[in-house]
Amino acid sequence: MDIKDPIHGYIKLNDDEKELLDSPQVQRLRRIRQLGLSSQVYPGATHTRFQHSLGVMYLAGRFADSLNLDEDKKQEIRTAGLLHDTGHGPFSHASENVAEKRDIDHEDISCNVVDQLSGKINSDTDRIKKIIKGELEIGQTVAGDIDADRID
């Protein structure tokens, strides 16, 4: 399956990624603004976490290609890129203080989503969670100082 992205062109998804994309946990990202409340001031600031997550998945895959990683690691990185923001609440970072009061962050919640979707993920879910948290060296492609998340 291909998805047309205004920035990255056609993004290819394999069957596993399509199944994750169709999950309620990922589909809800269509209703969460990437820039939080900025769209209230800047009408053009309307892109969503869904669009962003597709871009991060794509860029993470490009990083994996550049690093000559094997297909298993590439799939782990792409999956982490797709799911890395599923833990965001309404209005994105503007609502993070609610989670912080419970001593959790959106990455923790995203890791819980990985657990919820584990039956649809044909990769090592523990490694995917570590990539989301930036705990593995290859996690720097998704959760580092210069990463697919910040580039998108």
Task: State what each model feature region is.
Residues 1-32, 40-78, 87-152:
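Sequence-structural signature of the catalytic-core scaffold of metal-dependent phosphohydrolases
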